[in-house]
Regions:
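Extracellular/periplasmic bilobed ligand-binding domains
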Residues: 196-260
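Hydrophobic alpha-helical segments within soluble ligand-binding/sensing domains
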Residues: 122-145, 256-276
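Structural motif
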Residues: 51-69, 185-205
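Periplasmic-binding protein-like
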Residues: 18, 73-84, 108-110, 208-219, ...
């Protein structure tokens, strides 16, 4: 910090508590961005920040419910559930009266499907940016077939990502898409988010032989594909998801970047000023999510992305209604 800069007065009477999934925050993940945003916001505002890493989802849910139910005197708390997996449990808890909105405690969930008067929600839609990505991919002359890996189709942003990409690709030409859902056997299975080693050993070699591009809507599992394409350049293209992944492989022509860190800063700032919206959508029309094309591909792909940008925004608006 520069000499003479204003230092925010630390306020112990306002606390932000973030309950993460059992797997932690990982690399290039939504959880990592949530942590960064929460830390940056609380640090700049002088608020107390308490990250919690439970040993299991059950433990995480119990922690969330206990935090919301427990009343505090002389302190205001914003409790954030940093994983979609918590949504169903929190909805059930709210319906049973275990989650109650109060002046002292607010519960924020990053989920567009969760609606309940006692729960605040924020959501970053994925359809428009993925539509744009699919359209750009269709303009690449060496891309005809795409393997799409899905960690779990019950998550809205994953469904939006898959549908948006396919719709955008087919807008220009008909492509071949092979979709694999890790949760086919058990709809509650979330292991598909954490299979980077298996992706590197088994899935990536298959993709190298049969597919031109991989769209990994599966959290940290993407690291297995990036590692393979880095070690065997030219095997297949990988679409970056959540963060800009072009530094991890020269075969990442573009990334669908979610600025979840900025979303957290916005939500925490609004809460600290007592203006937190009950639900807010952070869309591509305002730059909360965008398609990032690295310099090595920009001369070829950026004009295509610019060409379809307005239509992608319009279609996302229709899709979200």
């Amino acid at each position: 910090m520069k000499e003479g800069a204003d230092v925010p007065l630390f306020r112990n009477d306002m606390q932000v508590i973030v309950v993460f999934p059992p797997a932690g925050i990982g690399d290039l993940t939504k959880e990592a961005l949530i942590y960064q945003g929460a830390f940056r916001a609380t640090d700049s505002l002088g608020l107390s920040f308490c990250p919690i890493f439970p040993s299991s989802f059950k433990d995480g849910v119990e922690t969330l419910v206990q935090l919301v139910k427990s009343d505090v005197v002389g302190r205001k708390r914003l409790i954030i559930a940093a994983d979609y997996e918590y949504s169903a449990y929190l909805r059930r808890a709210a319906e049973e009266g275990d989650v109650v909105d109060s002046d002292s405690t607010k519960l924020l969930v990053l989920d567009g499907d969760l609606t309940h008067p006692d729960i605040y929600t924020a959501y970053v839609p994925f359809y428009g940016t993925m539509y744009k990505a699919g359209y750009v991919a269709s303009k690449m002359t060496d891309v005809e077939s795409v393997k799409i890996y899905i960690a779990n189709s019950k998550y809205r942003y994953i469904r939006e990502g898959k549908e948006g990409f396919i719709d955008g690709f087919n807008q220009n030409k008909e492509g071949y898409f092979d979709v694999y859902d890790f949760s086919t056997i058990n709809e509650d299975d979330t292991e598909g988010f954490y299979k980077s080693t298996l992706a590197y050993i088994y899935d990536a070699p298959e993709c190298s032989e049969f597919y031109d591009m991989v769209l990994p809507l599966c959290g940290e599992t993407v690291m297995g594909f990036l590692r393979y394409s880095r070690e065997y350049p030219g095997s297949f293209y990988t679409v970056g998801v959540t963060a800009d992944m072009s530094a991890y492989s020269s075969d990442v022509p573009f990334s669908c970047v979610e600025h979840l860190d900025r979303v957290l800063v916005s939500c925490i700032t609004d809460w600290s000023k007592e203006r937190l919206a009950h639900h807010r959508t952070f869309g591509m029309d305002e730059g909360w999510v965008e398609l990032v094309i690295p310099e090595s591909y920009s001369s070829m792909l950026q004009p295509v992305a610019d060409e379809i940008h307005a239509q992608a925004i319009k279609l996302e608006g229709r899709y979200e209604k």
